Amino acid sequence: MSYVASNIQVLKGLEAVRKRPGMYIGSVSINGLHHLVYEVVDNSIDEALAGFCDKIEVVINSDNSVTVNDNGRGIPTDVHEEEGISALELVLTKLHSGGKFNKGTYKVSGGLHGVGISVVNALSSFLAVIVSRDGKLFKQTYSRGIPTSEVDIIGVSSARGTKVTFLADSEIFETLEYDFETLSKRLRELAFLNDKIRISIEDRRSGKEKFLEFYFEGGIKAFVDYITNNSKNIQNEPYFIEGSCDDVIVSVGLKWTEGYSDHILSFVNNINTREGGTHVAGFKSGFLKAMSEAFRDSKISKKDVPSLTLDDFKEGLTAVISIKIPEPQFEGQTKGKLGNSYVKKIVETIVHDGLLKVIDDNLLEVDIILNKAIRAARAREAARKARESERKKSAFESLALPGKLADCASKNPAEREIYIVEGDSAGGSAKMGRDRFSQAILPLWGKMLNVEKTREDKVITNDKLIPIIASLGAGVGKTFYIEKLRYHKIIIMADADVDGSHIRTLLLTFFFRYMRELIENGHVYIAMPPLYKLKYENREHYFYDDLEKEAFLGSIETGKRDKVSLQRYKGLGEMNPTQLWETTMNPATRKMKLIKINDAIQAEKIFVTLMGDDVEPRREFIEQNALDVVNLDV
């Protein structure tokens, strides 16, 4: 297929980008900075989807500029008839210009964020593009979207491709420091979704040198294996379904584990559709029909089995759904949800027919999966009965807050916060030291439940979790409603030792599995009590890590250091109410960590590794991360 200037279609100019960058890249924070890289990489991926590129290299240079190099056809350099300038300059200086807007050039495009590489150019203090094409090497440079050179021929080349180097504009962005892990996560994702494309990322910044390369022949199947590699799997290999209809290409990978949570990832043209859409609705419909038919036709006894639902069949399932579609219609600027209505029926049919074939080829494994679904249905019924039992209690009983909760006076959830505190003694100090208007205290006691190894019916009736569920007031699991949340800050306060770390992890696992919106909406925090109290010249100083402590000690004259009194806190109970308030609870001076999910796949893997049944992955994880541990209780 030819790719020349006439394939470049212009929609409108570039004037507004620098004035309102947030409209085009979401924000001028580090997320917007990363968005620039994704835009350039998306152009290379479009070439790969069209069958002309199989290698993409990303380099973070020592000066915080970024280079993206591919072996595609190279951006055309001939003159565009309507515009009277080279196609290369057109693509880099006009908003919404590019081959992806012309159906004849790319049937499927992933880089259609409503922006394109011209926005990267507009928001860069410097950009250079080198094109290898037609036996020649072309180069043009820009500053803040304005050409600073002509399209010059700088040599000959037997290769082909496009190399873009840009330095984001410090006048626009809050930071120019890229996060290697965030970029590599997205590039790994792209390599899974587009098998047999080799994508590498290199960090050349001083002290941060790193290199990663991603190449997966298995594509979606390899993606599913990657997500589930620390889980106890029911299948040896992921099931794979693919098909196409009316230019819609559907690929689905499925694998069941022995766990209780399901994990469904969906993509349209390589874009993560976090809110789902018609393709996910089609998947669920086709999946439910096929699994219901498999159960109906199986030899498994149907006696006393509740009616099996989608959730029952999904228990322990990891699925990756990827579709390629010529003209996706996304709802919202974030591309969070696919809206093309005709896609649902196509995906439903392909998944239904493909899954039935897979089932016929794997009857023994499928019997294990169906029996798992039956156990899930029985647990669901038990959970329903437990909820009904709670509802049948008097209104006073069912709404009663736990007796150990010391609530606060404010009625406004936005200004209310709850400290979930390990131990009665620390809870007592916290109750005495708190701000009674806005701070509630809920002490924990006894052994916490590991929800990773427990079905929902056991979770919602657990005597250690019921006080937390009741205090927060928003329900749990499938009946969790964040608008009912009684506190907008949920602060986990535990000792700075191994037991405290374990309690924090158990609570975070519970929130992640049964109240994930708490984390997604920024409501969960970890309190950071000090590790040391240092007394010197009748003044007390608190330090939260060894670096702070050593820096302070280093500032004291050598001869006076014997006058320093140093205490290392092992537990919260060692502090009196005033000290606990001053160091850990006073909003003006305290330190807290906000819990965020930057990488949902990695979070899933870590919770399964740390809290699941399999010991070996947990041992490996601890060995690999032991060097990163700052305070280790032995």
Curated annotation (Swiss-Prot):
GO terms for molecular function: ATP binding; DNA binding; DNA topoisomerase type II (double strand cut, ATP-hydrolyzing) activity; metal ion binding. This is DNA gyrase subunit B. Binds two Mg(2+) per subunit. The magnesium ions form salt bridges with both the protein and the DNA. Can also accept other divalent metal cations, such as Mn(2+) or Ca(2+). Mg(2+) 2 binds at residues 495, 497. Its cofactor is Mg(2+); Mn(2+); Ca(2+). NCBIfam families: gyrB (TIGR01059), PRK05644.1 (NF004189), PRK14939.1 (NF011501). A type II topoisomerase that negatively supercoils closed circular double-stranded (ds) DNA in an ATP-dependent manner to modulate DNA topology and maintain chromosomes in an underwound state. Negative supercoiling favors strand separation, and DNA replication, transcription, recombination and repair, all of which involve strand separation. Also able to catalyze the interconversion of other topological isomers of dsDNA rings, including catenanes and knotted rings. Type II topoisomerases break and join 2 DNA strands simultaneously in an ATP-dependent manner. The lineage of its organism: Bacteria, Pseudomonadati, Spirochaetota, Spirochaetia, Spirochaetales. It catalyses: ATP-dependent breakage, passage and rejoining of double-stranded DNA. GO terms for cellular component: chromosome; cytoplasm. It comes from Borrelia hermsii. Belongs to the type II topoisomerase GyrB family. It is found in: Cytoplasm. Its main location: cytoplasm. Heterotetramer, composed of two GyrA and two GyrB chains. In the heterotetramer, GyrA contains the active site tyrosine that forms a transient covalent intermediate with DNA, while GyrB binds cofactors and catalyzes ATP hydrolysis. Keywords: ATP-binding, Cytoplasm, DNA-binding, Isomerase, Magnesium, Metal-binding, Nucleotide-binding, Topoisomerase. Gene3D superfamilies: 3.30.230.10, 3.40.50.670, Histidine kinase-like ATPase, C-terminal domain. One of its GO terms (biological process) is DNA topological change. Its EC number is 5.6.2.2.
